[in-house]
């Protein structure tokens, strides 16, 4: 979202949204996904936030295990480790996250109906199976990273 304002190959960003802007966008996305959940009665649509949710939740769990103050600043998110410790460029890290979330979402939208028609389970059942498999794979990848 902020890429159109912040990405300037040879200069500084024209606009910096920071946490406040990110939270505003998050509320809009949560409203849209919440509306979809209410319309369908299927909570598995939260998968559209899975990559970012896994990183956020597991980072909090990691910090709790380390007895860190959750109110203090940190650099423990995977994207921060990739950019700061591994020196991978921010554009590459952001692109990786976006493409990973896109792949999870596209798989959810297109693969579940195919599995429903081939294997006979309901679409909602495949949504739950897909959600748990994706959650497990992302969690293992996070822990191994």
Which residues are covered by each model-predicted region?
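Alpha-helical transmembrane segments
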Residues: 1-145
């Amino acid at each position: 979202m902020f890429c159109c304002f912040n990405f300037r190959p040879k200069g500084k960003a024209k606009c910096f949204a920071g946490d406040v802007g990110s939270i505003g966008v998050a509320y809009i996305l949560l409203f849209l996904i919440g509306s979809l959940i209410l319309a369908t009665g299927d909570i598995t649509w939260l998968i559209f936030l899975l990559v970012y949710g896994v990183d956020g939740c597991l980072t909090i769990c990691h910090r709790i295990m380390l007895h860190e103050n959750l109110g203090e600043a940190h650099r423990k998110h995977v994207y921060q480790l990739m950019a700061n410790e591994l020196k991978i460029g921010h554009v590459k890290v952001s692109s990786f996250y976006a493409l990973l979330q896109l792949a999870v979402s596209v798989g959810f939208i297109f693969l579940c109906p195919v599995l429903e028609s081939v294997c006979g389970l309901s679409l909602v059942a495949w949504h739950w199976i897909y959600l748990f498999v994706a959650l497990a794979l992302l969690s293992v990848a996070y822990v191994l990273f």
